[in-house]
């Protein structure tokens, strides 16, 4: 076995269990722009898939990853992937056994498109060592992927920057080829954008605004309808200093195990760390938040923020 790690900025490596055990998770070799988004044990016979914010997927067999100590910086994807852009980031990564199963992913974009695509589309391609391939088509340079994850026949919840929420079943979204564009996910206003998309497999979700206000809302407050609608308001509009959605996601139930930034939450102790623009870090345990009304603006995480 080996430990595979991927950072948001695109540093990847595998590390021996011995090196991993001799360090803490925080001691990973890193640069200032680092955020670890994936770490998992894997066998050298398995495969790593990495999905980027620009709609590209990168493939690596685990045995081809550079074997690097936990405390040292990994290999940057731009060293080998010739079409890796300077503004490109990894949004989701996973280790897989095979490509011929029925796994399907959903991908949602900032400008309000959504699609489903099958894993078999990413069966290792001839030029994988030097080129990524498309998994989603973006509308223009301002567009990017806000969420991608494997999905079964669940509902998805979309939340826009201006505070609209829309829920529908993923069956409304056709399964298409990796290079195809998606369908309209949400009817966004001209000045709005999709900020979050996640699977409705828990009873509540959280929402953090750019002003530092946080709340937890019951999923039942957003009844399932159909795609391409505007949705329901989950923030009250203020004339002065309006709240805008900064981050949103599902709040885990007891007995799940997983990752706060995953679109499908499976974790039993979910803590949100928020860093202000002054560098102060605030900590909130999401399950401890009282349920708020759908249109409330939540509570500030600190009196001084």
Spans of model-derived segments:
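Short, structured "edge-of-domain" segments at secondary-structure transitions
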Residues: 1-305
